[in-house]
Amino acid sequence: MSLADKVLAVNNDLPIRSTQPVHSGKVRSVYWLTESDSRRLIAEKGYNVAADAPLAIMVISDRISAFDCIWHAEGGMNGVPGKGAALNAISNHWFKLFKDQGLADSHILDIPHPLVWIVQKARPVMIEAICRQYITGSMWRAYEKGEREFCGIEIADGLKKDQKLPELLTTPSTKGILEGIPGVAAVDDVNITRQNIEDNFAAFNFTTTQDIALYEKLLKEGFNVISHELAKIGQIFVDTKFEFGYVKDKAGNEKLIYMDEVGTPDSSRIWDAAEYQKGNIVENSKEDFRQLLLNHFPDPDILLNKDRMAERSDLAKNNALPAAVLMKISATYISIAEKIIGHKITLSDNPKAEIIEILDRQYGLID
């Protein structure tokens, strides 16, 4: 079996029993379970949720997305070996730590396989909750052009690229396209201020205005927990994106939880601390892949200019990258995951077959 065969590139074709269409994202696919299967699993497994809570199977792939496109390599390699397992392992680690430290729960109820979560359906807060500890990336590019206000926060003059910010900044953006909100453009991923959120809290799916402060508290506390733990293994937590949502517990009480993924190389920038002290930036995140792409193609503006999205899509579809590029990313993801969780990650030889067998034999979910 070749390495390409071990990559789970297509994750929306599993024979999981469902009456709804599979929701396929850039990396994950979600299978909504039937009401009867949800109720059965809640009773059989003792999940701490309401008896009628909707459940889903969330399957992560090894696909890699950057600049809003999915990339592939030569030799039929349509993903990064070990990427999905690494991302899930990291998120599992941080979610458990958050819960153990009394921050908040996550949407995950069960982990049948390294690539699979059983989750409780949440009502998402429509905000990409971004936290920044260093000035880099898009924030630096805007700062370099003279911008000094970010999401309603004034930034001082005199900052240098990649330096640590005077304080941890929350710079939220919209999750998807939100229409009809005064002062907020109806485009994907647009920066918003705290005032925007306060004035339109219901449009962002907050239940109360008090929950805005709670989301900010959970964001900053979660960031600090991860930053503290990464420092122990010689890594810097540069910036990240969290997502939040509401679920109901077994008693029917609504609570705000962490969801999606947290502290992964896909959702965060992570730098090597020793190299940073020497003045070098060594990425242990997807930012490394983004830089590889920018250096690989002769016209990087295609990747950065949103007005050239059609060209960018063609570029990703019609250009197989050298296999070594995806293998380098594989090594980065697996290495940082193993440092974080403290043990080796075992990769599946045939992930799709393994997932189907487990969901059939242990959960009775395969038709």
From Swiss-Prot:
Belongs to the SAICAR synthetase family. The keyword Cell inner membrane does not apply. Pathway: Purine metabolism; IMP biosynthesis via de novo pathway; 5-amino-1-(5-phospho-D-ribosyl)imidazole-4-carboxamide from 5-amino-1-(5-phospho-D-ribosyl)imidazole-4-carboxylate: step 1/2. GO terms for biological process: 'de novo' IMP biosynthetic process. Its EC number is 6.3.2.6. It is an enzyme of class 6 (ligase). This is Phosphoribosylaminoimidazole-succinocarboxamide synthase. Transmembrane segments: none annotated. Disulfide bonds: none annotated. HAMAP family: SAICAR_synth. It comes from Psychromonas ingrahamii (strain DSM 17664 / CCUG 51855 / 37). NCBIfam families: PRK13960.1, purC_vibrio. One of its GO terms (molecular function) is phosphoribosylaminoimidazolesuccinocarboxamide synthase activity. One of its GO terms (cellular component) is cytoplasm. It catalyses: 5-amino-1-(5-phospho-D-ribosyl)imidazole-4-carboxylate + L-aspartate + ATP = (2S)-2-[5-amino-1-(5-phospho-beta-D-ribosyl)imidazole-4-carboxamido]succinate + ADP + phosphate + 2 H(+). Keywords: ATP-binding, Ligase, Nucleotide-binding, Purine biosynthesis. InterPro entries: SAICAR_synt/ADE2_N (IPR028923), SAICAR_synthase_Vibrio-typ (IPR014106). It comes from the Bacteria. The gene is purC.
